[in-house]
Swiss-Prot record:
Gene that produces this protein: leuS
Family: Belongs to the class-I aminoacyl-tRNA synthetase family.
Chain span(s) of sequence motif 'HIGH' region: 40-51
Taxonomic path: Bacteria, Pseudomonadati, Bacteroidota, Flavobacteriia, Flavobacteriales
Region Disordered: start-end pairs: 548-570
Protein name, UniProt field: Leucine--tRNA ligase
Organism: Christiangramia forsetii (strain DSM 17595 / CGMCC 1.15422 / KT0803) (Gramella forsetii)
KW Cytoplasm (keyword) present: yes
Primary location recorded for the protein, binned into one broad class: cytoplasm
Amino acid sequence: MSYHFNKIEEKWQKYWADNQTFKASNDSEKPKYYVLDMFPYPSGAGLHVGHPLGYIASDIYARFKRHKGFNVLHPQGYDSFGLPAEQYAIQTGQHPAVTTENNIARYREQLDKIGFSFDWSREVRTSEPDYYKWTQWIFIQLFESWYDQEAEKSRAITELEEIFTSEGNSRINAASDDDVEKFSADDWNACSEDEKEQILLKYRLTYLAEAEVNWCPQLGTVLANDEIVNGVSERGGYPVVRKKMTQWSMRISAFSERLLQDLNKIDWTESLKESQRNWIGKSVGAHVDFKIENSKFKIGVFTTRPDTIFGVSFMTLAPEHELVEKITTEDRKEEVQAYIEASAKRSERERMADVKTISGAFTGAYAEHPFTKKPVPIWIGDYVLAGYGTGAVMAVPCGDQRDHDFARHFDLLIPNIFENVDVSQEAYAGKEGTVIANSDFLSGLEYKEALNKVILELEKTGQGYGKTNYRLRDAVFSRQRYWGEPFPVYYVNGLPKMIDEKYLPLKLPEVEKYLPTETGEPPLGNATDWAWDSKNNKVVSNKVLKQSRKLSGQHDEPNSNVTPSAVEGSDDNGIYPLELNTMPGWAGSSWYLFRYMGAGNPDRFVSEEAQKYWENVDLYIGGSEHATGHLLYSRFWTKFLYDRGWLTVEEPFKKLINQGMILGTSAFVYRLEGENVFVSKNQINGNNVQPIHADVSLVNSSDELDIEGFKKWRPEFADAKFLTEDGKYIVGREVEKMSKSKYNVVNPDEICQDYGADTLRMYEMFLGPLEQAKPWNTAGITGVHNFLKKLWKLYYDGEEFFVSDEKASADSLKTFHKTIKKVTEDIEEFSFNTSVSTFMICVNELTAQKCNSREILEPLAVLIAPYAPHIAEELWEKLGNSESVTTAKYPEFEEKYLVESMKNYPVSFNGKMRFTMELSLDMSKEEIEKTVMADERTQKQLDGRTPKKVIVVPGKIVNIVG
């Protein structure tokens, strides 16, 4: 009987759905195991063959753990808020909820076809109100919390208020804004409620603050660093500028040390841990204050090398530094302003990466050196970032190469403070063994001695102190978008108030347009019903508000700095404006792993019982590109929820594996610069051409372009001319990321239709190690498909299903147990590609051995089930089993079947091998010698002679001498 994979796969996919085969229980005596994939954003393009790679790997492992007796939670859902759906809505007028629903239906169809063992009863969607109700709830808890740095934990804001009431803030060590001033209990108690709230905002774990953000005017929103590529938005390629806006921020910086130290508690790759370590960026040094001449201001800097303080010859501020405008002299203002505007067009990543371009502007102001009291010129330069440290550096050109380059470029002094070191051509960054010179009380001291001494002196004179600094900055949490979680916030006298938890979720309102308003407000400014009735706790019409809402950060003009105090509600009727921004894409993904544990719970984001049972994720699989985004934010929120008693774990993911990409083979056509003429690859010959991606479906296996199809594909190419080679247009080829934008995607639906889902699953694993990038190549897929056909034939005698109850041969038992051992080890080490090879060898050997024994073939169906579940289910049923193969116990490896009982001994005469004899490994030396000597072949070789001696090495050789 033929292997009808389409019918088999459709049959078992329906069976799994109808019987909820993979539904996990929260009440089980089995040990738990939680396997999770990074959930997908449901784009309109659907899945390509690169997307399922990690899902297949996690599914193999989830199925394996079920066979091993674990209660496995393997859920799936959708990260369904996001910018792409909003952009599509802007272009088409279609509501993002509609396109998202359509896209999810398409994703679900594709995922089901591949045969994943997901527990769909726990599906979550971040854009559903019953889900984002709890995202809003977590936001409120963050707002109602502060961070106790001494206890290293989050605490309720009410506890902080009690401390302020009894003793002020002089004795607490709390994470706060930099501009917090000391006050007594009397000072606090004398404050009005609004004044108290303004102070508390400086301590809350989510707070309103002015921040430098990446603003994209065309998209009308703030973008995260990872949403910008080469200074333009990743989506759309629009220009991005740096701009100050008042935004909601998360005080993640308070958790820096815990985020750093707890990396030692989790099983992640070292490269990913290192990415987070670098992002958190711990450094130890000193804070130094430089007074500004003829001014009340001073500049605070953080430096890891305070021992080099006598080498300071100028200071550099970030162009965005708040003091720049205040200290710039009249004659320098025009140049400084021009430089600030130019810098705003470059992203922070560009500025950090560009070490060759040297630029800056002199402010005309001078600082006073803390020890020499000499004037130090103050410059601005975009190599200094406003968000790192204090946004200012004490420039030591002899000890820092960027300072050295800057000084040489602008002809500034380069004083040398290192003994026996030449710094005329380049800076010297050495530490150990370095002797400080020309540095007053530090001269003659080595690095560490000088470091400690200068910190003591700074502290003694009140000009600085020792400090540990972190690169990690508080995370901007506002987005000027429609399709995101609404903030559960309304404003009274410009101050934020939280909606009572009982009235969550605050649902997204309907709007006519998804673009910012004409006055620059975010899209929610288009809503007609978007005010909060605080007496009746419901959303009402905006018309009752006294003024138009002008929430901060909702204006197109650069450097907009309208604060929430501009928002006025009605004191008479208790109706107030709601926040117009929405939350960022990472809000819903920061806690979704816990919602899966008890999805649908209306009373808690996760029940205590469910969370205590499942704890956290045992295995998480997803891309390494999320190292400093989602993975860091999720760790932050988990620690916060743990601190406040809502979780029993401090880390979300125990083990993390980053799958590599499946790469596509792109096709390129070459257009002559300035013309609509395309030159075949081998006829470029030095012409200036522009490579353009062509859809790979228009190219055959010989790299020939379907010219007529290409003309119809894109309207702008309809009248194009083609310079061909013998009538053929040959495209260029390049292996790169598989992406819709590169027109090189391969649809998994087609593979499933032509070869089957089991073939797709095994082939994706066969391509190479899970963590490595690998090109997609359909050339090898027929080999995997033929292997499954061969597996199928093992269970058949001609057209009849036939499995014998006879005892398996020793050879077949050896083959099978060797396979069990290798495949089990491979799965446990996530080496899935070598497992597929092992299965192929196994089936080839069993076929050659004509094995049809149930003793082998029944457990073989279980062994291969994690990889090829559909064919395994079908064979398992044909073997007479009534339950799903998923319930079967995993085959156990038995060493005895691999132990050799016989040995093929080479028999030599005077060192020359003449024949072999198969003898039992249990035989003694004497028995071996006696048996060999009695053999007629031995007697023929001796020809009547008596040998001088017989050398027997048990298990190896027999050598007859003489």
